[in-house]
Amino acid sequence: STQKAIELAKKYGTSVHILHVSTEDELRLCANNPFPNITAEVCIPHLWFSDKDFEQYRGLLKCNPSVKSEKDKEELRKALMTDKIYSIATDHAPHSFEEKQKKYLDCPSGTTSIQHSFLSMLELYHQNYIDLPTIALKMAFNPSKKFKIKERGELKPGYYADLVIVDLNKETLVKKGDLFYKCKWTTVEGMKFKSSIVYTFVNGNVVYNHGKITEQPKGMLIEYC
């Protein structure tokens, strides 16, 4: 299906953004692409887990598309610093813990990832898969550019101050009691990240401060160019 979408985009000169690339074969289709209107996105679960992890997490790890082999995961990580990957997303799709305990074929697809998505990417930075400017490029600037989001995705005068301040040298242990998800589960529970989130700003307001939500919601309608 990915190959067909790319062929149609080339044939008709239209744009296509391939979501949730999960295999080495899909990466090959995106390699050496002379068409700037054809781009691809990778999600946190496919960068972080492989089919080896199903025995431990079972239905909690079920997502669509499914996580693939260890080799696929490694190739996705290696592609982060190349133009094969245009953007990085969370694919955050929570379901209740009870729903995810059903038999694999009966439980819904989707994992929780948004709270620890940035920490996951910083961990890959520590492992030398990606540098800090590219994390910002592919998690903020490129998505805002692709979807023509007005005054977002950059730190510049006149733009909304949506940003994160991190401590690259302070570890974070993921504990259930620290989760902000209503479903109260995550596949990274018990993991230790080398970095931590210190502050989060939304529209110039501090909404997260050293592990605590500090403000009432400060969201605004997103405008498009």
Question: Can you annotate each of these PLM segments?
Answer:
Residues 103, 160-222:
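C-terminal cap of metal-dependent C-N hydrolases
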Residues 15-18, 62-68, 122-127, 147-148, ...:
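Short, well-ordered beta-strand elements within core beta-sheets of diverse protein domains
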Residues 26-32, 216-225:
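C-terminal/domain-terminus segments
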Residues 16, 41, 91, 121, ...:
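Residue-level signal for inorganic ion chemistry
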Residues 1-3, 7-13, 81-88, 93-168:
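His/Asp/Glu-enriched, well-ordered alpha-helical/loop segment
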Residues 54-62, 99-107, 179-184:
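Short glycine/proline- and charge-enriched loop/turn segments
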Residues 61-73, 108-112, 186-192:
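A short acidic, glycine-rich active-site loop
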Residues 1-88:
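Histidine/acidic residue-rich metal-binding segments in metalloenzymes
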